């Protein structure tokens, strides 16, 4: 949950030889179960107090959960951005409007250790960007801190507390 120090850290890469280890494979299974039980569409390892560069996501109802390890994202600026109304399992009951790229190139290892590169669009791209932010110690609420700092104390008092 918000306030936990692991959520603000830049996560460490997973060594390639560790991807198929029992520890990582068990963590993957546990994260998928946790994500589904919470009704989420994504969950990053830092959200379960593991500061490693991995997340799971299930942006489509009838597809299997995807495992994304050591991802890199290239933002496709020419495709433009859009406002995304997002919730986060680390900030229950709150939603934030965040500007996201419509299209990204995503490179990562899957749970079998295979290297994958693909172009992601739409909701899948948004979920990937949200979870990727977690790997860099960024929460959706962080996008609003610079705005809040410029408000008067009276205006800040009107903002709901997390």
Q: For each predicted feature, which ranges?
A:
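Active-site rim/adjacent substrate-binding subdomains
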Residues: 1-129, 133-162
């Amino acid at each position: 949950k918000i306030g936990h120090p692991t959520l603000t850290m830049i996560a460490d890469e997973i060594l390639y030889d560790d991807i198929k280890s029992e520890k990582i494979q068990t963590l993957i299974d546990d994260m998928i179960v946790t994500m589904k039980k919470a009704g989420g569409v994504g969950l990053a390892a830092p959200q379960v107090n593991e500061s490693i560069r991995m997340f799971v996501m299930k942006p489509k109802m009838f597809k299997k959960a995807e495992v994304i390890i050591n991802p890199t994202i290239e933002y496709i600026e020419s495709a433009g951005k859009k406002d995304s109304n997002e919730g986060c399992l680390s900030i229950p009951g709150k939603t934030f409007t965040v500007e996201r790229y419509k299209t990204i190139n995503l490179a990562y290892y899957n749970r079998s250790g295979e290297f994958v590169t693909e172009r992601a669009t739409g909701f899948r791209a948004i979920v990937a960007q949200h979870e990727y932010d977690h790997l860099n110690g960024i929460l959706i609420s962080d996008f609003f801190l610079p705005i809040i700092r410029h408000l008067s104390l009276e205006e800040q008092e009107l903002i709901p507390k997390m």
